[in-house]
Each structure stands twice: as structure tokens, then as C-alpha cells.
């Protein structure tokens, strides 16, 4: 008499198992030729931590915060070399000009929605001023990026609060990073499917330095989806200018690139440009209304800039230009895979006004990739 119950339980467990999203490599998709790090995440770069706050309330609040910390110390007092590359500048990335001028980061990076940027700035200022050793600080270059999640989220309600940002900063950790419709990716849309947060990494061989490049993305853009060179968007008949795609192509993509390679700001900008090439490989087109930005930084401790240093000169031990090509390839591969992970890990969400954005249909995608002999 227990057989019907047991059978129903098995069916339920099978359905749950089938419904669980899988990352690209979990599906047999192997993008590029370089191996990933242990977690295949930006946190494979030693010292980098990620924190997220997901805000889902009632029928219309679908937003959140994602933060990336370059190291566990006082970032203002020990600034890291950094660069920003603007692929298409229809966005509101706060802190850009000082990073470009001075070549460093002095705060964590915050990602949120467009109308939450000011809140992110206030939270980063509070966070910085409250740290020991910063009692005399009177200027903070808060770096806050955004995408517009207003299709699914009541963005005008400005539901992201300082406490949400501070919570993400407080709970930031290393190890695996949650992906999909979480944090700053809770309400985003990508290629007409549910977008979100994605991450990936690449590890160079020891003979090339053994360096790690990690990428985290917040995907909210459009185009013609490609996965590992396969025209998935066309096969699904859902793409920019296609008859079946109702969602507009305009959106944004924030890309954060971390590396432990000793790079100065000039070569970090060169690295950032390669991340944009990774976006292009997924079929993104950097449309007119898209804010596509790359923030790149190095965690190398010997390249940090002490805020209180009295030394008139700095010694530079950065990599030579000739050593950059393997890192370029790593950035391209990791960015491409991070974007695909953001799609595969996101689940269907219904939000503001009853709007529903479907997840990328993983089983159909697997079938398409098999057709093109791209599954391993």
C-alpha cells in the first residue's frame, strides 16, 4: 500500500532534479581551451570575496545588490590597481573618472539597479568612513555599477536600501558564488530570457605564470545568443529583430574582471577590453541603449597603493606587455562562460505587472548543442 506514495515521491524527486539549473560545464559545455579554477568563479582569485542581497517582495519587487571586494583589508588604505573600459556608455557607473585618472580602486565594487546607484554610493561611503584607520577620510570614490531591471522590478519604488548594501558587504565570502536571479541580477533580462549574475575563471599554466583571471557579470542585454559558437538564439527563433522576441534589446552588462597577475592600470585596461570581446562572442551587440562596462583590478599585494605612504616614488614590478596575451585569452573565455552561466542558472520569474520572463530552456539548448557536436 506504500507503492503509490513511493511512486509519487520518485516522480516528484525526478521533476525537482530535472528542474535544477546547471552551469555550462555541468551540461557538458566546455568554452575555450584554458582550465577553470577550483570554483570556476571570480573568487578563484585569492582574496576576492562576493556578497549578495536578493530583494523579492510582493508581486513587483525583483531587485538586489551584488558586491565584489578585492581583498579583506582596508581597501581605502590599500588601494588596488584598476581600470575601467566603456564598451557603450549609456549607463551610470559611479566613480569612473577617478579610476581612469588615478588607476586604482579604493572601495569595493557595488552592482545594483539604475535608481539604486545613489544608495550604493551612500552605503560605500558609510562602509569606508566606519573602518578603523579612516577617521580622517573626507573623500571617497565609491564605485557603483548598474543595469536597469525595470521590466520586472518596480524600479521607481527604489527598494534597495543602504542596509541591503551593507549586508552584502558584511556577508561577502570566498568559495562558490550563487548565480542566476540573485543579488543585482534578480530582475534582469538577457537575450529575451531571464538573465542574472554569472561567474567563471581561468587558470594559466605555471610556465605562463600560473595566474588566475576571474570574471563576474550582471547580464541585462540583448542580441543574438550564441553558446560556444552555436547559434542558439536563431535555433530557438528568439533573437534581436526576430519575430518571436518581444523584449527590447536595450539593456546593460556590468563585467568585473579580477586577476592576481601583477598588472598596472594600463594593462588592466587592455585586459578589460578583452572581456568585451567575450561578451561579443555570446552574441551581445552593445545596443544604443546599453550601458556596457568592464571594471578590472589586480590583487597583487606588491602593487597596492598605501593611502598614507610618504614615499615620493613607487616601484613597479608589473608584467611586461609581451606577457599579456595568455591573460587576454583567459579574460575572453571567462567572460563568455560567465555570461552563459548567468543564463543557465537563472530560473523563470514573474514580476511587475504580471510580466513573466522565462528561463533559457536548458534541455532544448542541450539538444541544439548536440546537433552541432558541441557537448562533451
Language-model segments: residues:
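Alpha/propeptide regions of enzymes that mature by internal proteolysis
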Residues: 20-376
Amino acid at each position: 500500500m506504500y507503492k503509490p506514495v513511493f511512486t509519487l515521491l520518485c516522480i516528484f524527486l525526478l521533476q525537482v532534479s530535472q528542474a535544477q539549473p546547471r552551469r555550462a560545464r555541468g551540461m557538458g559545455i566546455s568554452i575555450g581551451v584554458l582550465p577553470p579554477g577550483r570554483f570556476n568563479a571570480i573568487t578563484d582569485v585569492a582574496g576576492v570575496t562576493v556578497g549578495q542581497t536578493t530583494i523579492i517582495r510582493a508581486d513587483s519587487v525583483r531587485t538586489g545588490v551584488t558586491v565584489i571586494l578585492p581583498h579583506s583589508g582596508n581597501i581605502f588604505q590599500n588601494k588596488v590597481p584598476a581600470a575601467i573600459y566603456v564598451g557603450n556608455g549609456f549607463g551610470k557607473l559611479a566613480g569612473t573618472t577617478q579610476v581612469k585618472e588615478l588607476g586604482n580602486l579604493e572601495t569595493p565594487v557595488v552592482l545594483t539597479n539604475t535608481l539604486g546607484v545613489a544608495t550604493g554610493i551612500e552605503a560605500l561611503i558609510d562602509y569606508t568612513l566606519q573602518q578603523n584607520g579612516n577617521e580622517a577620510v573626507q573623500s571617497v570614490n565609491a564605485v557603483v555599477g548598474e543595469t536597469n531591471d525595470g521590466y520586472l522590478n518596480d524600479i521607481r519604488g527604489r527598494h534597495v536600501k543602504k542596509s541591503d548594501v551593507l549586508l552584502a558587504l558584511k556577508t561577502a565570502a570566498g568559495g562558490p558564488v550563487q548565480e542566476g536571479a540573485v543579488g543585482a541580477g534578480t530582475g534582469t533580462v538577457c537575450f529575451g530570457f531571464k538573465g542574472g549574475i554569472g561567474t567563471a575563471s581561468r587558470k594559466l599554466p605555471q610556465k605562463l605564470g600560473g595566474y588566475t583571471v576571474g570574471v563576474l557579470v550582471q547580464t541585462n542585454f540583448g542580441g543574438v545568443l550564441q553558446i560556444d559558437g552555436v547559434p542558439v538564439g536563431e535555433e530557438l527563433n528568439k533573437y534581436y529583430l526576430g519575430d518571436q522576441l518581444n523584449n527590447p534589446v536595450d539593456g546593460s552588462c556590468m563585467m568585473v574582471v579580477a586577476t592576481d597577475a601583477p598588472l598596472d592600470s594600463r594593462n588592466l585596461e587592455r585586459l578589460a577590453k578583452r572581456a568585451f570581446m567575450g561578451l561579443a562572442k555570446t552574441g551581445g551587440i552593445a545596443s544604443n541603449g546599453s550601458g556596457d562596462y568592464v571594471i578590472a583590478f589586480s590583487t597583487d599585494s606588491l602593487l597596492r597603493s598605501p593611502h598614507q605612504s610618504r614615499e615620493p616614488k613607487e616601484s613597479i614590478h608589473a608584467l611586461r606587455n609581451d606577457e599579456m596575451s595568455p591573460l587576454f585569452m583567459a579574460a575572453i573565455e571567462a567572460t563568455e562562460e560567465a555570461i552563459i552561466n548567468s543564463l543557465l542558472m537563472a530560473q523563470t520569474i514573474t514580476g511587475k505587472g504580471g510580466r513573466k520572463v522565462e528561463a533559457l530552456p536548458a534541455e532544448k539548448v542541450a539538444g541544439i548543442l548536440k546537433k552541432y557536436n558541441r557537448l562533451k
